[in-house]
C-alpha cells in the first residue's frame, strides 16, 4: 500500500545532535506534505515544546498533528485543537511523587506554563558527554517557566499528562523496576532516553494514540511509516506498516 502518513520521533530522530532540524530533513518533510502525505510528530515532549518544530516544518499549513507526552495528548497543530487528552489523576500522581522521594532521581512535572521541580539547584547529571543541567535543558525545551516546589506531592493540585524523572543512566537501569513496581497496574512507564524514565496514564503509548488518530484520518497502519530511536518508540515502530529504527537507536 502507498504511504499516506509519516510519523517522526523528535529527539534522536528528527533532530541532529545540535537539536536542530537539518535543511535536508526539513526540505524532504515539507515536500512530502506538499505531495499530500500527513506528517505527525510523536514525542515524549510537552505540546509547547513541539510547536516551534512543527512551525518550522509548516505543519499548520498541511494539517499536521502532534502526539505529545508519549501519546497522552494529540493535537491538530493548525487549530491547536486537542483531539485526545489522557491524564494521570491528581491522587495517583501524588502517590507516585511521594514514592519517588526514596530514590535519587529528579522528578519534573508541568502545566501549560510552568515546569515544577523540588530543587532548582539539584540539576546536574554526569553523562559520558560531560556534566549536564537537566532542569535547564528540559524547561527550555518545553518553553516553560521554572518553578520550585519543595514537596511536589503535597503542592500538586491538578492531573498530569506525564511524570518525568531524570537520573544517572546506571542508577535508572538498576532501580527503574523498583520505581515502577507499585504502579504497574495503574500507569504505563518507559525510558525515553537512558537518563529519562516517564510515567503516563495506563495503556498510553505512541502506538495506541497513533491508532486513534489515523483511524480519524482514514489511514491504515499499513499506510504509515514511522521513525524512532528510543524505548518509548518501540510500540510505534511495531504498529506502523513500516517502522524504521534510527542508526543510534537503543537495542530492543
What residues fall within each predicted segment?
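Asp-based phosphoryl-transfer active-site loop
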Residues: 4-19, 96, 237
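Short, well-ordered beta-strand core segments
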Residues: 6, 66, 106, 243-245
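Phosphate- and divalent-cation-binding pockets in alpha/beta enzyme and binding domains
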Residues: 24, 49-52, 174, 209, ...
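Conserved acidic, metal-coordinating active-site core of Asp-based
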Residues: 99, 103-105, 110-227, 231, ...
